[in-house]
Structure formats: structure tokens, C-alpha cells
Amino acid sequence: MNATAAPNSALERYYQFHSRIYDATRWSFLFGREEILRRAARVTQPRRILEVGCGTGRNLVSLRRRFPQAEITGVDLSEPMLAIAASKVRDERTTLLRRCYSAPVHESGAGFDLVLFSYALSMFNPGWEQAIEAAHADLAPGGSIAVVDFSHSAFGGFRRWMGVNHVRMEGHLWPRLAQKFVPLLDERRPAYRGVWQYGLFIGRKQAECGESVS
């Protein structure tokens, strides 16, 4: 695992504890994680994959199973979460980086064919807009972004509680994603009979003038 320095933050302190119970508890409310991978596999067969907010590595394991030949990079701010991820993914084609995602990962080269955010962007407060911009810069022309995340809730008390847990639930992600990428999938789903909604988005980066999509 490679590491770069990351500043201390409330989010890091939050996951210092939650890393120990994350895999045992998140199945009950982080819906759509397998579906977004399944839907992404319909539109791309990526050679280079980036997951932002890879956490304990659950999606990294699924990505490796679906795309066995791909080079995979996982980025997260939490050292305890990355330590768990490192125990799950031990192949030479997977790299883990500890860093904030406020700027692109790659400095030069081909870029990534797929960037995945799984219940990450709604916790980047502030920073979600910069993360979307960084993902756009990290993607190769014609590359795809896949996002599954909380959307919104009509219940103010629930929104406030999620805010205590660093989650912003205002439906703010989807318009920006649809503006920045060509939408291939853009859906909202109810959870627990409408207590909240979550969203699934897959979009494609358009080639700039003079660039070609292979």
C-alpha cells in the first residue's frame, strides 16, 4: 500500500471508530452498491479503475472479481479503513492511497477508464464539487463515472441526524453530475418506504476537441 500524508479531520475521527463496525452494519442501509457495479459493467470494460472513498475495500474486491485484468486504485482518507482494505486486496495490480481527493490522482498518462464513488460524495462537505472536477480530470476521454449515494429525505429530523454522521442529503449531487458528464443512468430509489432516497448515476466523459475515444 502506498500512502501520502493526509490532514486530520472530523471525518477521520469518525471512521477511527466506525472502521471497526463498518462491514457489519452498512449492508442495512447502503443500498445499490452491487447494482452500480453491475450496471457499470454493461457500459465499460475498464483497464484502469479508481475508487474514491474505497473504505474497507468491499467494492475493491467486487471490482477485482468483475474486472480481473484491470489496474485498480483505491483512495481514502481514513488510515484504519485502508488497513482493513489492505487485508482484503493483496494483488500487485491494486494500489491503495491515503489522501484527500481534491485533485486528480494521475499527473500524466492515459487516465482512468472508470471512476467509482460509492456513498462517498455526500460526505465531502465541503469538497464534493472539487471531487467531481478531479474525477473528470482523472478520466480518460470516453471514460465513465459511476456514483451510488444518498439523495434526499423529506424528514427534517432524519436529515439532521445524517448530518451528525457527516452526510448531506439535499439531492445536490445529481444536477452537477448530469451537467459534467453525459448521463447513461440517472435514477432515484426509495429506501425504507420513502424515509430517504438514494441515487444511481453513470455518466461518460466527452472527448475534448482534438481528442479521440478509443
How would you name each of these model-derived features?
Residues 142-150:
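Conserved beta-strand signature within the Rossmann-like core of class I S-adenosyl-L-methionine
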Residues 50-52, 56-103:
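Class I SAM-dependent methyltransferase SAM/SAH-binding core
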Residues 166-181:
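Short alpha-helix
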